[in-house]
């Protein structure tokens, strides 16, 4: 519960600042919470939340309709959305630490605003290092480490072996995952590392002199697996094989297609050559559409001819 401290509207929407809030504002690569505010006015949707001033400003709630100033409200966060964000964020901490341990790869930026998340690394990562990191991150999931957040002063920071230096000054919020990872972070996290799994690396690529790693985690990784498994099952049924042997019939089909394309091209060229003398002699000639392009190329070599 909270009191509405300030409200305003403009051509883009309606806004409110509350005396206190549990709505997480978009920050640190993590999307904002959504949900509802309830009060004497009824119910309005919270569409977005952001900080007026980065790290220390009031949280501004973007609303679906205006509300009066000074009233008491009750907020409800869209919990399924929040939980998925927490899974992404805790999984990112685990994967970033695993990448550091497996290959000495340092995380410089993250994006958690879609089910497919990214971690940007300073170094060019090798396949063996990324795969080892994926396994290590999932071992950390199975270890069921406790996740805890606490604040320390700027002077106390030197006592803590942080994965990366903090970007803020003054009191700093740290997130510790057992004895596996410790990092400065203001985001929302799970209670234990086990809730973040599974963690699946999808791919990685060179990016700005380093590497961008794409991954999914938690329910979203499981949903992705279900979708891909269903697709493989349908394809396996169509090719009368099992999912793990699909590559062979697909490659065979590709080879047959390439061969047919070659034969088709040879037939078009042969027919175009056969029709060329008649096309040069006759004013009008009916030509099969697939051959028209090849015949046109040949006619273009002769002056005064056109299609």
Q: Can you say where each PLM-predicted feature lies in the sequence?
A:
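Conserved nucleotide-binding/hydrolysis modules and their immediate coupling elements
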Residues: 1-71
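Short, hydrophobic/aliphatic alpha-helical segments
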Residues: 5-22, 70-82, 167-182
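Active/ligand-binding-proximal structured segments within catalytic/core domains
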Residues: 20-37, 68-119
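Polybasic, low-complexity association/targeting segments
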Residues: 32-33, 41-49, 125-148, 298-299, ...
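Short beta-strand-to-loop capping motifs
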Residues: 63-65, 121-125, 215-217, 289
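Functional cores that coordinate and move charged inorganic groups
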Residues: 81, 100-207
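Terminal appendage regions of diverse proteins
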Residues: 196, 202-307
